[in-house]
Amino acid sequence: MSLCLWKQCLDRLQDELPNTEFSMWIRSLKAKLNNNILEIYAPNKFVLEWVKDKYLNHLKKILQDYCGTNSPLIKFEIYQIYKENKLKKNIENNNNNKNEKLIWSNIPKFKNLSYRSNINKRYNFQNFVEGKSNQLARSAAFQAARNPGNSYNPLFLYGATGLGKTHLLHAIGNEILSYKYDIKIIFMNSECFVQDMVKALKNNAIEKFKLYYRSVDALLIDDIQFFAHKERSQEEFFHTFNTLIEGNQQIILTSDRYPKEINGVEDRLKSRFSWGLTIAIDPPEIETRVAILIKKADQNNVILSNEVAFFIAKHLRSNVRELEGALNRVILNSRFTHRAITVDFAREALQDILAVQEKIITIDNIQKTVAKYYKIKVSDLLSKKRSRSIARPRQMAMAMAKKLTNHSLPEIGEAFSGRDHTTVLHACCKIEQLRKENHDIKKDFLNLIRTLSK
C-alpha cells in the first residue's frame, strides 16, 4: 500500500512539474508509510529543506486527493536513516546465509595503491560563473560534492564542448578534497581508462586494474562518449560502475550528448548512465556571457567595461572557450599597442571573427523563413495564438533555432516573446517525434533546413 501510494504521488508530481525540476528534487526521494505517517527520505539536508519548503503543500494536496480525510501525515528524514534501518534488516535476514556474496566494496582499500586525482586546483565553484543555462548543473554538482555517494549517483552532465562540464568536474573534486583529505578520487578522460585497461591486459595485471578503479571513493570521467565502439572497455566499465554504485561510491560522468544519443555504446550502459540525475548544460545566455567576460578579464588584471563585454557577448554566443579566446585576443592587442579597450578597439581586434559570425544563421532569420514558408506573419509566430496553423510553425521555428544556432533554450524562448525554456524543449521534442511519424512534417523540416543553409 505504501509503495503504491508513493508511486501515485510520484506520477502526479512528474505530470505536474517540469522534467528538470522533478529530476533535480523529487526523483531522489524515498518513502514508506508507517502508522498513517508518510515518511519521506531525502538524500541530504539541503534537498530535505528545499522539498519541505517548496513541495509540502503540493504533496498534501495530492495525498488528500487520493486518501480524502484519512490522508497520512508527512514526516521528512535524511536518507541515511532509511539506509541504516534497511541495512539492519538486511543483516538480520542474511545472518544465516552462508553463500553471502563477496562484493568489491567489502574489499579493504589498500594504502599502497597510489591514486592520481589529476584535479586542477584552478577550477572551483567560486570561479564558475552561474546563469540560467547551467544553474541546475552547478547546484547538482555542488550537492554531489558535499554528499558523495548519497546525492545524485551517478550524476551525468551533458552539453556541447566548451560549456563548463570539465570545470564542474574539477570543482567537484576540489570541493570534496577541501573537507576530506584522505579521500580517493580519480579524475580522467574516458580515453585514459581505455589506455589503462589495455596496459593492464598487456602486463597481465587486470586484477590490479579492477582493484584500482573499484576501490575509489569518487570516480570522475570526462567525455564518456569516447567509450563508443570499444567493447572490452565498455564491458569492464559496466562491472566497475555496478560495483561503485553498490558501494555508494560517487560516479560523475560528462558527455557531449544525452546518454541515449551516444552511438556505439551498449544499451545497458546507457541505461545505467541515467540511473541518477541527468542534466543538460546549454550555451550561456547573454547575461552569463557578459559576467564570464568581466570575471575572466578581472583574473587577467584587466578592467573590462560593461559596454565592451556586452559587445563581445552579443557577437559570440556558442561557448565559453570561444568567449575566452576572443577576450584574450582583445587583451593581447591592447597590451601590444598600448591602446585602451573600447568597443571600437574590440571590433577592430575581432574583425575576422565578427565577419564569420555575420554569416551564421540567426533566430530572426529563422522566424522570417518559417513564417514565409507557412504563409503566416512573424507576429503570428510571436503571438499567443494556439491554433494548429500557428502553433505548429512556431514549434518548427523553435526546433530550427535549437538545431541551427548556438542559442540556449532560455534565449530561444526569449526570442519568441519571452516564452519559458521548457516550452522550447517541448517544441523540439514534439517536432522530433512528428518527423518520425508524419511525412509532411519531415518534408517541411528538410525543406526549411535547405533554405536556411543556402
From Swiss-Prot:
One of its GO terms (biological process) is DNA replication initiation. NCBIfam families: DnaA. Pfam families: Bac_DnaA, Bac_DnaA_C, DnaA_N. It comes from Buchnera aphidicola subsp. Acyrthosiphon pisum (strain APS). ATP binds at residues 162, 164-166. This is Chromosomal replication initiator protein DnaA. InterPro entries: AAA+_ATPase, Chromosome_initiator_DnaA, Chromosome_initiator_DnaA-like, Chromosome_initiator_DnaA_CS, DnaA_C, DnaA_dom, DnaA_N_dom, DnaA_N_sf. It comes from the Bacteria. Belongs to the DnaA family.
